[in-house]
């Protein structure tokens, strides 16, 4: 038998807390305790009934929570049918509720004992009808009202009872609870409710890691190892429930420092960490933006960054969401305290304020500070200790596999729209772009695109574009090779122009001494490359002035085929103070440590040390800096070859500098007529007859001249008339002391 009743509000708050449908005493017989209420065809909701005289006949009262769940409006006509539960199959053995405060604005950190809550719930609602998804209001010990949502219902499977098997449980859509029903409370997602006790179920938490992220979509390549390391150190603890973390006594990592050469992807990586995480949009702050001209405003700017996190931590406690704050160029505001001149001390107080916010007396556990810098050495040490920016990750230059990934990312759209030729092999380009950073690889792709576009532009009186450019435009292999040769050079690459300048005349093999020097030099190169080597090989190329030491060192550096070759020359430091010179030398070595294979050519060491024989005088500060750097081992896995040249070996020995070198290569002068003749044959200035005549004149004479001096005399002879060249050459050699025309005794 169906009744047609109109919906109305629940007459009193006390009746609302019963979570039952309120009907008039005269509308239903005493034995009917449950009703199937249907607000629309196909919709059925099972309610327990509460009979009272406070509801008019022909009406059924619902609380606001019940009306929302059953989608019932005031004065809506409802079809109400009496309902009877099956005593054997509809008895709920276990119910699980998703629990939160009914009114989210009035939250409390007061603990709620889930065991006591379960007992109280059974006392209040024994015999109650429940449906999965049903919303209820629960008043526990006059504390703040709780909102419950039925998450799951379990009942005994009657088949297992009939077959004599072990009792089996099955999930049901609705049922009624009895005095022995097990009640569990699970905290709702992002709820600040503090549940305690054994009747506490699983906590509903949103995974901190976004499920659909990947490096390719984020535009990041070659940083898989770094991301894995950051995840292990910084995010693994945040994946687990706060209760487990609390039981372990574990503290989350609050800070990450990303450092490394410019253009390697530090800022991109930090920006995309927010995409990787299910957290609030990160606050990205440029370091200098923090500083303010007004007293105290710089510190206030730091406090404002943490204000939201502090407020949420107080309100939600361990259930607070993660707040990410990213500092770009953090070295601008976190320099070593006491290192900045001036009496304002603004930088020092900003550092102090940041230290206290990250890990001070009132600790915040819901923040992650990410700092980025090229100059890790400038940052205050207190900021780098555990509890602050404790995860320090070097974002180094990508290896060949990483360069392939980066090139794939930057050429992806061209491949999608068929704007790149099949002859472009990213693996080949990656092999050619040693020590290129991510930004430089992106620049290389742009330069190749510009080269391809330029082919379709006609620059006559007017600049016109080929009308069929859309179809013709394709980037090919030659575009990449052209850009690699002319447009983009790596900051941590080979100083090719300087080496070519040093080798303007090449290395002339005038005899066995030169061959032996090149062979020995290549042995040191192989020693530096060898996996089992210590990682540091330093060689002094010593010899008389003008003997070709610089050219030999440059030739060895070029033959090494190291991706990073830098020249440290006194020419680049003219006018530098001692401290500026030391900083310049140190920067060259620091840059070398960032490459897997590096070679540094330190030319003319005694000039670098400001050595003067009258006095004598030298720069002790520069000497000590060089001694330290020559002996310093590069980081693990990095290899460094140092080639130094000097014309004053005895001076370096007095300065106790020779012991800093692995070995010494002695470059001799030309000491035999055959040596000079070999050079003359190589220069193609003198005819064979002239060379033979010069050989006869020099036979039995003492020869001692440097290759550089000899080449200078040959250039001078080039300007002389053909008939006088040989005579002029020999006379100048004698004048310069390179040839003693007196016969040997």
UniProtKB/Swiss-Prot annotation:
**One GO cellular component, as annotated:** neuromuscular junction of somatic muscle
Q: What is its EC number?
A: 3.6.4.6
Keyword check for Magnesium, yes or no.
Answer: yes
Q: Which PROSITE patterns match?
A: AAA
The record's listing under CDD domains reads: RecA-like_NSF-SEC18_r1-like
Q: In which tissues is it expressed?
A: Nervous system.
Q: Where in the cell is it found?
A: Cytoplasm
Q: Which SMART domains match?
A: AAA, CDC48_2, CDC48_N
Record note on cofactor = Binds 1 Mg(2+) ion per subunit.
Q: Which InterPro entries match?
A: AAA+_ATPase (IPR003593), AAA_lid_3 (IPR041569), Asp_de-COase-like_dom_sf (IPR009010), ATPase_AAA_core (IPR003959), ATPase_AAA_CS (IPR003960), Cdc48_dom2 (IPR004201), CDC48_domain_2-like_sf (IPR029067), CDC4_N-term_subdom (IPR003338)
Q: Which family does it belong to?
A: Belongs to the AAA ATPase family.
Report what the protein is called: Vesicle-fusing ATPase 1
> Which source organism?
Drosophila melanogaster
Kindly list the organism's lineage: Eukaryota, Metazoa, Ecdysozoa, Arthropoda, Hexapoda
Q: Which gene encodes it?
A: comt
């Amino acid at each position: 038998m169906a009744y047609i009743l109109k919906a109305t509000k629940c007459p009193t708050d006390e009746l609302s807390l019963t979570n039952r449908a309120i009907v008039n005493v005269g509308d239903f017989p005493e034995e009917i305790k449950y009703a199937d209420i249907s607000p629309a065809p196909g919709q059925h909701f099972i309610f327990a009934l509460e009979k009272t005289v406070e509801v008019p006949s022909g009406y059924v009262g619902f609380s606001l929570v019940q009306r929302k769940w059953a989608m019932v409006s005031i004065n809506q006509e409802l079809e109400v049918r009496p309902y009877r539960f099956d005593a054997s199959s509809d008895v709920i053995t276990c119910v699980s509720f998703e629990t939160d405060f009914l009114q989210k604005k009035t939250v409390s950190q007061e603990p709620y004992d889930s065991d006591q809550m379960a007992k109280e719930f059974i006392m209040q609602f024994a015999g109650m009808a429940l449906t999965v998804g049903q919303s209820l209001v629960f008043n526990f010990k006059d504390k703040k009202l709780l909102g419950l949502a039925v998450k799951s219902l379990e009942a005994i499977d009657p088949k297992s009872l009939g077959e004599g098997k072990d009792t089996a449980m099955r999930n049901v859509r609705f049922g009624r609870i009895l005095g022995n029903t097990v009640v569990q409370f699970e905290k709702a997602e992002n709820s600040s409710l503090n549940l305690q006790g054994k009747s506490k179920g699983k906590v509903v938490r949103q995974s901190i890691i976004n499920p659909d992220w990947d490096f390719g979509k984020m535009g990041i390549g070659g940083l898989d190892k770094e991301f894995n390391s950051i995840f292990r150190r910084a995010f693994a603890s945040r994946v687990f429930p706060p209760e487990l973390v609390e039981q372990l006594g574990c503290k989350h990592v609050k800070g990450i420092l990303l450092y490394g050469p410019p253009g390697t992807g530090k800022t991109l990586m930090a920006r995309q960490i927010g995409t990787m995480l299910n957290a609030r949009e990160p606050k990205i702050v440029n370091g200098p933006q923090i500083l303010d001209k007004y007293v105290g405003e710089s510190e206030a700017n730091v406090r404002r960054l943490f204000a939201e996190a502090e407020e949420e931590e107080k309100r939600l406690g361990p259930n607070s969401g993660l707040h990410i704050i990213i500092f770009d160029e953090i070295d601008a505001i976190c320099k070593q305290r006491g290192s900045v001149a001036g009496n304002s001390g603004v930088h020092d107080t900003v550092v102090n304020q940041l230290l206290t916010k990250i890990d001070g007396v009132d600790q915040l556990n819901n923040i992650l500070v990410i700092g980025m810098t090229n100059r890790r050495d400038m940052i205050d040490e207190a900021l780098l200790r555990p509890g602050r920016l404790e995860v320090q990750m070097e974002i180094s230059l990508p290896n060949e596999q990483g360069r392939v990934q980066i090139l794939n990312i930057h050429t992806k759209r061209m491949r999608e729209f068929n704007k790149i030729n099949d002859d472009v092999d990213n693996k080949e380009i990656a092999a050619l772009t040693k020590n290129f950073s991510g930004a430089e690889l992106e620049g290389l792709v742009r330069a190749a695109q510009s080269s391809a576009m330029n082919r379709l532009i006609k620059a006559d009186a007017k600049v016109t574009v080929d009308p069929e450019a859309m179809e013709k435009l394709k980037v090919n292999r030659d575009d990449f090779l052209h850009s690699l040769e002319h447009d983009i050079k790596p900051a941590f690459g080979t100083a090719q122009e300087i080496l070519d300048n040093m080798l303007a005349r090449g290395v002339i093999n005038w005899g066995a001494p030169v061959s032996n020097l090149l062979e020995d030099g290549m042995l040191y190169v192989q020693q530096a490359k060898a996996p089992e080597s210590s990682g540091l090989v330093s060689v002094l190329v010593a010899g008389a002035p003008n003997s070709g030491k610089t050219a030999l060192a440059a030739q060895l550096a070029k033959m090494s085929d190291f991706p990073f070759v830098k020249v440290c020359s006194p020419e680049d430091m003219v006018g530098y103070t001692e401290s500026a010179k030391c900083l310049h030398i140190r920067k060259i070595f620091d840059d070398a440590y960032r490459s897997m294979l590096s070679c540094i050519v330190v030319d003319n060491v005694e000039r670098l040390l400001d050595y003067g024989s009258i006095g004598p005088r030298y720069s002790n500060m520069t000497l000590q800096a060089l001694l330290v750097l020559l002996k310093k081992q590069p980081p693990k896995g990095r290899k460094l070859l140092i080639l130094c040249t000097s014309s004053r070996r005895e001076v370096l020995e007095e300065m106790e500098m020779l012991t800093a070198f692995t070995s010494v290569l002695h470059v001799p002068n030309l000491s035999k007529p055959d040596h000079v003749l070999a050079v003359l044959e190589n220069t193609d200035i003198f005819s064979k007859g002239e060379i033979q005549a010069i050989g006869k004149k020099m036979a039995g004479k003492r020869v001692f001249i440097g290759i550089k001096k000899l080449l200078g005399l040959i250039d001078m002879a080039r300007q002389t008339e053909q008939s006088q060249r040989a005579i002029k050459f020999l006379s100048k050699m004698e004048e310069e002391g390179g040839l003693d025309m007196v016969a040997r005794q």
